[in-house]
Amino acid sequence: MLSRVSQVSRVGFSLARASSTARVWVDKNTRVIGQGITGKNGTFHTQQAIEYGTKMVGGVNPKKAGTTHLGLPIFASVEEAKKATNADATVIYVPPSGAAGAILEAVAAEIPLIVCITEGIPQHDMLRVKDIMKSQNKSRLIGPNCPGIIKPEECKIGIMPGYIHKKGKIGIVSRSGTLTYEAVHQTTMYGLGQSTVVGIGGDPFNGTNFIDCLERFTNDPQTEGIVMIGEIGGTAEEDAAEWLKQYGNPNKPVVSFIAGRTAPPGRRMGHAGAIISGGKGTAKAKMEALTSAGVKVVETPAMIGEAMFNMMKAAGKA
């Protein structure tokens, strides 16, 4: 696989850019292909996406090229699939050993949005992927080790349960998959709904961070409030707090929860990136940084929906 990674890293990138109507990367017009959709997990979640209304337009499997699966044409390569379907997004269900190669194949084909669900990709492989991603500007990676992205009632790319989502006004970004679903459920129950929900994943080396999502949500007219779910490890939340201080919209309230307050230093808590190291990455530091940026930081995930509703009500938006 690493030889394949090296090969893709030498691919040049043209100035052509696929057009998209999406404000936060996906909408009803997003055309999606799948890598690894003929496997058990890929088949299940692709079927769910089709039933949700996502425009799935094809799949990639070199060994099954020329056949169909779930009514979708299967192609030998991502490049071939893009040319035939005009896809502007791909979802990756490839096992860990081949996932980095799958990401880089999509980068080489200049797919605008790459969503990698796969968990357990070797960090060495992701370091290489991240380095290559920085050298181009045609593709965006969400993940890996994430639930994906969904614009309720329009497009679902990933493994999240579609039925708990409701079209609405809250943008949600999270490092945790299950806590994402909790925030979705609560904002649905309070009648706020969601504009777009992005699971950025819990690995140390991911493609899309909090700031990327905050920037999109801040500039998205449909998004009127933001929920941000972080966890211990790294400095992504502190960086997001600094961004909010400079560029945040005071008319778009932000609620946050940080998981892992009781975690001991040096012990990984679930995600590969959820570890306090060298005195950095503590929940306390993250909560203080976000609070100083005007974010309402809640003590438990059970308070996310209520806090968001109260802030929206105070702003005359609920």
Curated annotation (Swiss-Prot):
Heterodimer of an alpha and a beta subunit. The keyword Ligase applies. This is Succinate--CoA ligase [ADP-forming] subunit alpha. Its EC number is 6.2.1.5. Keywords: Hydrogenosome, Ligase, Nucleotide-binding, Transit peptide, Tricarboxylic acid cycle. It holds the Pfam family Ligase_CoA. The gene is SCSa. It is found in: Hydrogenosome. It comes from Blastocystis sp. subtype 1 (strain ATCC 50177 / NandII). One of its GO terms (biological process) is tricarboxylic acid cycle.
